Amino acid sequence: MGASTSSPPLVRRHHWIVRLTHWATVIVLAGMIASGLQIYEAYARFGNRGGPYFVSPFDGAQFPHWSRLGGWLAGALNWHFALAWPLVAFGLLYLGYLVRSGEWRALLFRPRDVRGAIEMTKYYLHLRREHPPQGKHNPLQKLAYTGVIGLGALAVLTGFAVYKPTQLAWLTTLFGGFQAARYWHFWIVWIFVGFTIMHVFLVFAVDPASLRAMLSGSYRGKFPSHD
């Protein structure tokens, strides 16, 4: 008789709330960005007419029609505001799960992770052969996810500062005024875009099993990242 082979064990990785909020946020955020580009087209600069303004390489830019949502300013604003509330709700649901389950401990970047982040950087740059030891998330992932959560909070706050500059004058002032809040809100979005591109690249290049786990919640065997 031939030697029996058993399939690798099924390992649970992502709770359904994590998967739901992840994919729902992808869809809603795409709509927010597309409608935001249409809103920006209405006045493609950061400053009052005839006054000083924040310099941006996107001054006067016209984004491709396929990348914009809403058709015109009013339509884009309707989409943007309608999608903002689900985005906030999904964010709060995700944060609530992290706190209730204790998963925040495995996700939060702390000072003790600095050395591990340096070693992971060396590994990705092929300056280190062995994969550094890690837990559920490696230190660079912790740094990225902690930063994204912080940026998400800033995106919401700057968004409200632009949405209600009179009613929330204290918040608008905190960010340097209406045009400054617009400026920070706009650039936070591009940081999200950059993070998304890098995130997708690393998923396929380093941890393809993580995509299966984010779809089904589980994976068989070990991640390529040795977690």
Regions inferred by a protein language model and the residue ranges of each:
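Membrane-embedded alpha-helical bundles that constitute the cytochrome b-like, heme-associated redox core
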Residues: 1-227
